[in-house]
UniProtKB/Swiss-Prot annotation:
Residues 56-270 form the Radical SAM core domain. Keywords: 4Fe-4S, Cytoplasm, Iron, Iron-sulfur, Metal-binding, S-adenosyl-L-methionine, Transferase. This is Lipoyl synthase. NCBIfam families: lipA, PRK05481.1, PRK12928.1. PANTHER family: LIPOYL SYNTHASE, LIPOYL SYNTHASE, MITOCHONDRIAL. It is found in: Cytoplasm. One of its GO terms (molecular function) is 4 iron, 4 sulfur cluster binding. It is an enzyme of class 2 (transferase). It comes from the Bacteria. The gene is lipA. Binds 2 [4Fe-4S] clusters per subunit. One cluster is coordinated with 3 cysteines and an exchangeable S-adenosyl-L-methionine. [4Fe-4S] cluster 2 binds at residues 70, 74, 77. Pathway: Protein modification; protein lipoylation via endogenous pathway; protein N(6)-(lipoyl)lysine from octanoyl-[acyl-carrier-protein]: step 2/2.
C-alpha cells in the first residue's frame, strides 16, 4: 500500500477503517422481518450499504420503491439492470404499513430509475409519499429521487407532495460523471437540485470519493452545490460492490473526510456528513432540521 496526501492507493485489501459490523440484535431482526413480510425492497440490501448494521440496529431503513430492477446501468451501483416489472399498485400502502409497524420517526425513500414509464415513476412516488403521510402524519420524510430526465413538471410533483427533505445525488465530480453514471448528466442533476432548493424545501446531495477525482474537483463540486443553495451534502468512500462494477482508484483516509466536512461547513452547508462509510441516508433524521 502506498500513502500520499491522505490517500491510500487501491489494491485488493480494504483498510481497517472500512471494517463494518453485520446487522444484529432484535431491532435489526424486526426491520428484516417486516421487509420480508411486505415483500419490500431496501437500498440497504440491494446497494450493499456498509451502514446497514448501524441503521437496522436503530430500527431505521431506506425503502426502495418502483421495483428492484433499474433501467440504467451506473458503473458504481449494485442494483440489477434490465426490464423492470410493472409498478406494484399496493406498494404505497405496503410501505406506509411498514413505517407504522416499525414505529419510525423518520423514513427515507429512494427508487430505481424507471425510464420505461411515461412519467418515469413520478406519480407512483407521489402516491407513496401521500400514503406514508396519511398513515403516519408525525413521521418526517426524506426522498432520494432520480433525475426524471430533467423534467421540471415531474420534479414539481415531488415538491408539491411536501416531504421534509428532497435529495438527488451528483454521485461524482463533473469530469467523471460521464464515465460513472448512466444516461445522467452533471448539469441535469444541478438543474434538478436548483429547482428543489428554489422551492424552499431542504435540498440535499452527495458524492463518492475514490473514483479518481482531485481535491480541486471536490471543492468545485461543493461550490456548484452552494451556488444553487443546496443545504446538505454527504461525502463517502466508494466501495466496489462486485467485480462487475468500476474499480476503486483510492481509499481516502478518515482525516481527509473530516477536512472536507469542515471546508463544507465553512462554505455554508447546514450539514455535511463526511466519512469513509457515509452514504446518502446516513444520519438522515438530522437533516430535517437544516
Amino acid at each position: 500500500m502506498n500513502f500520499k496526501a491522505g490517500f491510500m492507493t487501491c489494491n485488493q485489501r480494504k483498510p481497517d477503517w472500512l471494517k463494518i459490523k453485520l446487522p444484529t440484535g432484535e431491532l435489526s431482526q424486526e426491520v428484516s422481518n417486516t421487509i420480508k413480510i411486505h415483500k419490500l425492497n431496501t437500498i440497504c440490501t440491494s446497494g450493499k450499504c456498509p451502514n446497514q448494521g448501524e441503521c437496522w440496529r436503530c430500527g431505521t431503513a431506506t425503502f426502495m420503491i418502483c421495483g428492484n430492477i433499474c433501467t440504467r446501468a451506473c458503473k458504481f451501483c449494485n442494483v440489477p439492470t434490465g426490464c423492470p416489472l410493472p409498478l406494484n399498485p399496493n406498494e404505497p400502502m405496503e410501505i406506509a404499513q411498514s413505517v407504522e409497524a416499525l414505529k419510525l420517526k423518520h423514513v427515507v425513500l429512494t427508487s430505481v430509475d424507471r425510464d420505461d414509464i411515461k412519467d418515469f415513476g413520478a406519480s407512483h412516488w407521489v402516491k407513496v409519499i401521500r400514503a406514508v403521510k396519511q398513515k403516519t402524519p408525525n413521521v418526517t420524510m426524506e426522498v432520494l429521487i432520480p433525475d426524471f430526465q430533467g423534467h421540471e413538471d415531474l420534479v414539481s410533483m415531488i415538491i408539491e407532495a411536501k416531504p421534509e427533505v428532497i435529495s438527488h445525488n451528483l454521485e461524482t465530480v463533473r469530469r467523471l460523471s460521464p464515465h460513472v453514471r448512466s444516461r445522467a448528466t452533471y448539469d441535469t442533476s444541478l438543474k434538478v437540485l436548483k429547482q428543489i432548493a428554489d422551492s424552499g424545501l431542504v435540498c440535499k446531495s452527495g458524492i463518492m470519493l475514490g473514483l479518481g477525482e482531485t481535491r480541486a474537483e471536490i471543492l468545485e463540486t461543493m461550490d456548484d452545490l452552494r451556488k444553487i443553495n443546496c443545504k446538505v451534502m454527504t461525502i463517502g468512500q466508494y466501495l466496489r460492490p462486485s467485480i462487475k462494477n468500476i474499480e476503486v482508484k483510492e481509499y481516502v483516509r478518515p482525516e481527509v473526510f473530516e477536512e472536507y466536512k469542515q471546508i463544507g461547513l465553512e462554505k455554508g452547508f447546514s450539514f455535511v456528513e463526511s466519512g469513509p462509510l457515509v452514504r446518502s441516508s446516513y444520519h438522515a433524521e438530522k437533516h430535517v432540521l437544516s
